[in-house]
Amino acid sequence: MREFNHNDLEILEEKTAWSGFWKLKLFRLRHRRFAGGWSEALTRELHCRGEAVGVLLYDPKLDALGMVEQFRIGAAFRAGSPWLLELVAGLVEEGETPAEVAVRETTEESGCVIQELLPVAGYFSSPGGTDEYFHLFCARVSLAGAGGLHGKPGEHEDIRLHVIPHAEVPELQRGGHFNNAHTLIALQWLAMHRDEVRRAWT
């Protein structure tokens, strides 16, 4: 079976349709087809988000997770609350590595200090319309006495940290309390690797 790569894509035109906090680019392109030959010229919109990081905070001694709650505009127009329970997360800025972002965002959003950082996965969050590439980590932290409000006021962040015993996670999942894809992926990973992680970190 033939494998396709960047040589099988031709960009005919590229322009910026919108530039604000995010960019929206408009492309005219064509690509090779599985049956042979080239597609007709296609128009595709691309929401340019770049790279992002998500961090699952885990305390192996307490066997507990740290989750943040904050308002999300993307959830504001569906049933349920637009305040989501999710991972610590943030964007990779120029000159930063994903691991550095994980450390920075963990401090800003939770007040916790990462003691050890374990890569979990890297993936495109929704490649049909955005170029965002997500780096997922699990971080060993101490959640003893953790909680309260966090975030950078200058960035209008209003974040509440929740400490959740791992034993309560299945019931919360069944109740639909985790509806963010990155969070669900991280929780599934922890369910598969929790015993191994606890042995390594305790």
List each language-model region with its residue ranges.
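Short, solvent-exposed loop/turn elements at beta->coil junctions and helix N-caps
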Residues: 14-17, 121-126
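A short, amphipathic edge element
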Residues: 1-15
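NUDIX/MutT-family hydrolases
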Residues: 151-177
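A short coil-to-beta-strand element that immediately follows conserved catalytic motifs
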Residues: 10, 113-120
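Active-site-adjacent beta-strand/loop module that shapes the phosphate/pyrophosphate-binding cleft
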Residues: 29-34, 126-147
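Conserved hydrophobic/aromatic beta-strand scaffold that supports enzyme active sites
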Residues: 24-26, 67, 136-138, 161-163
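Acidic, metal-coordinating catalytic segment for phosphate/diphosphate chemistry
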Residues: 16-62, 76
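Conserved Nudix-box catalytic region and its N-terminal flanking loop in Nudix hydrolases
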Residues: 44-47, 64-104, 153-155, 159
